[in-house]
From Swiss-Prot:
Extent of the signal sequence: none
Keyword Chloroplast: no
Name this protein carries in UniProt: Transcription initiation factor TFIID subunit 9
One Gene Ontology term of the molecular function aspect: RNA polymerase II general transcription initiation factor activity
Length: 137
């Protein structure tokens, strides 16, 4: 994946192997860094929540039940499944059944003519036999 893969941390190599197992042979190095950041942030959040649950029950050590509870609370907030296809189809049919409004000509912003535009190209095509002098800017 990356040219300096031998210098990468162990977790980056693990993510690289996971990507390869999914059929992704090449990617930008930023992809692996972003996945590492997500994994570290998600793991840290889960462990902090598990510690809060353990403290709430009066324990100083985190148990597997604390981690499971923390994971269950995270899944509902972070990994929301998309709505069913049939539901999206019904909504799109309802929205698309209304015709688009045609704006009034009075309420539109009028664009100035191209001759007065600042970015207009100002050029003339001169014939070889023309007596007009060429202007050079």
């Amino acid at each position: 994946m990356a040219s300096g893969e031998n210098l990468a941390p162990r977790d980056a190599k693990v993510i690289s192997v996971i990507l390869r197992s999914l059929g992704i042979e090449e990617c930008e190095p930023k992809v692996i860094i972003q996945l590492l950041e997500f994994a570290y942030r998600y793991t840290t959040d889960v462990l902090e929540d598990a510690l809060l649950f353990a403290k709430h029950t009066g324990r100083t050590h985190i148990t597997t039940s604390d981690v499971k509870l923390a994971l269950q609370t995270k899944v509902g907030r972070h990994f929301v499944p998309p709505p069913p296809r049939q539901y999206l189809s019904e909504i799109s049919t309802m929205v698309n059944s209304k015709p688009l409004t045609i704006p009034d000509g009075e309420n539109l912003i009028r664009v100035p003519p191209s001759s007065s535009a600042l970015l207009n190209l100002d050029y003339e095509v001169l014939r070889k036999d023309s007596d007009k002098k060429r202007r050079i800017y």
